[in-house]
Amino acid sequence: MTSDKDINDKLKTSKILWYMYWGFILASIVLIIQIIHLKVFWEPRPTTEHYFRPRNRKEILKPERGAILDHNGKLIAVSTPMYNIAIDCTVMKESYARDKKEGKQKEKEWKEKACRLAQELPAVLAKDGKDAAYYRKLILDGRSQNKQYVPITKGINHNTLVKLKTLPLFNQDKNTGGLIVERMDTRQYPYKSLARSVVGYVRNNEDTGVSKRRGIESKYDQTLHGTEGLRWKRITDNKGTIQDTDSAMVAVVNGNDVRTTLDIDIQDIADRALRRQIESEMDIDGGCVIIMDVKTGAIRAMVNLNRGSNGTLDETYNLAIARAGEPGSVMKTATLMTLLEDGLIRLDDEIETNHGKMKNVKDDETIKKYERNNKTDKIPVIDGFKLSSNYVFRYLVKEHYGKKPEEYLARLYEYKLADAFDFELEGFAKATLPDTKSKTWSPTDLIQVAIGYSATETPLHIVTFYNAIANKGKMMKPYLVESIEKEGDIIERFKPEILNGAICSKATADTLLRALKTVTSEGTGTKVKNARCKVAGKTGTAWVVMDPKYTEGRGGVYKDSNGRKQYQGTFVGFFPADEPKYSAIITIWSKPTLQSFHGGTLPALAMKEIVDNTYALDCEWGEEIEKKGRIPEMEAEEIYTDNEKGSPVPSVTGYGLKDALYAIENSGYRCVYEGWGHVVRQSPKAGTPLTKGQTVKIILR
């Protein structure tokens, strides 16, 4: 039999086990609740959060800004890497201090290397103009003051960086030599300020300053900029970083390239021609040139030169689209077109000269001279046009539209002379024509518009109108951007657009061609008579409305208190006259002056130079002629190379243009190319050893 003692022991044990069982159950419940709380509800305090999270940091990946290309694929703007250099003067200093046996000797050797480095830096960094003593003091002072960051130089290219890495200390790893290299992408413009007012300017892809708010760099900023990427780096125990593979990564998307309609060779020709005519004439305040492809409306050149306070001519303001004013006699072609289209006149019709007199307007001295020279009291319309007679066109408009001015003005609106084009660049000035329904309308406005007053036009409006005449009446919309591209592949293409299918009949266009050819052969535009191909065009001169503070008390708006006037002189036309390829306008503006400037002088001379050199540039117009236009290249210091004599040519087959250029120039060679797209052939072949500076040719399709 079981004794009472055994029974009591069993009961006691059972009771203990029962308590233990429920104790474990309760502990498990508490533990589960705590785990759920920690996982779902609990958040660490901000002050202690870093103790509970992995040590990592976010790194923003910057995109590479897309390039801006000309019509033929030449780089107008491109982002390239540049480097800032510094030195960590504390490297190995603590380690040497702890080394009781050899520490002092090693520290002495480090300083000796620093002195040799200082001795060689002036030759490599000659552009900084510092001597060896400067660098020696800079580095040794940094060492004694325990400075971890001592700037050495800024904005060097890859070639200079390679040379620096061969110098004492800098030829060691960064933990022993202290070299700090900071890469930055900078915007390079191989053609310098050429087309600056069209292309725009940025320092780099992060530039958000005022300088960027113009040109293609501004208008297409989002396209060029690209999209930032993101990755996480984990901090290691030795304060280094490694890729955190547990965290999400957002890939960087580099910017797209923008291919413009510009032809940089023609741009250079136009720039030099305009400069040559106005550079030495200090009374000229500025000028512009637009060259347009007749069939498409593509702008091949747009030059804008403004005279600064120091007298130099710079591309600071887009006069071609942003300056609207009374155009002068170039408007007579629109008047002549209207009269011809309405069947009211023929070029050989004659009108009474009447000594150039009309009521309420100044006598026309041109007519008086014509009467004396020709012993006549009549003048054919074509002679009035080639001599740019104000009387003839005032008379014709008053005679035929005096009682119905709205019909004449309606025609001008059809010619898009008051339209706001949907143009790629910002800052397009408003063109205006008078309105017969306006309270300010006066009958005088009719005869003034006929000769280019009482209306405001930009040079782009005028050349677009003349381009339509060259195109047999079809008016094309002017445009500046041809396509958006990615590594040579076209993402979006912008095709030519028609503004007006027929502003006039082909017969009228042919008649106007005859009249415009007469201007350049016998009339006010004879400065272009001996150009290398026939030019059809018209001159125009207008007084510029002056600031009221200069004209106060004079009773007019065109003359200041000293009798000075401001002039706008224009030559506009197309060439070759019989088979037009390009239309062009050259406009200059003067300061207040006692001289007079006309469209048949400086603008016409600039036009002749443009025609001659563009003719030489284009073999399709005749025999092959050596190209006269200077094509600027990047300075040698901007070609990045990491090789010495005998380095092999890199393989770039399949590359886009930008990557191919970078790879070849980064290897120390010059690059020339044909076509666009991707590289299909290169010469010499990949792997061929060349001497630094030799040329590699690539073909793209």
Predicted regions and their residues:
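Preference for bulky hydrophobic residues occupying beta-strand positions
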Residues: 85-87, 200, 260, 323, ...
